[in-house]
Amino acid sequence: MATKETWKVVTPIQSRDRIVWPVADPTLLQPSNANPLVMGELLQLDSAGKLIRATDDTKPSWCLIDSAGRADVQAISSVTVIGVDAMMFDTLVFDNAAAPALGAVLMQATVTNAAASLTNKSGFKTHAAGGEQVMGHVIQIAANNGGYLRVLMSRA
């Protein structure tokens, strides 16, 4: 489990931006899980309408904003996600082996950030040339932001 904050909001989040949604696998909310969900990870809806770790880069994804291990989140097996309006945030959940450049278009992918001890997380990487969903743009590179990638996400 990461001991450093994995995600920090730069712009305010209004109530209309947040949605509490059930997760398909409540064990991912437990810190003892081998690969638990962490704040800032991207989640998508499965065929049952529940949230799962994002794996399909052609579908919309939303950022998880609950801290890992919260008892209330585990009790209701639901998490809070955002991504309705434009927002800016700093994240460690990105591919730091191929760190996105300033202005880069971002997509969802399974990523590792060795510097932050995050492995196989659903996060951000530089957009490929295919039909993947655009998740945001880099507005400050990690090297100039304490290791965090600053992202501007603007989607409906």
Walk through the language-model features, giving the residues of each.
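Surface-exposed, low-hydrophobicity beta-strand/loop segments enriched in small/polar/acidic residues
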Residues: M1-A156
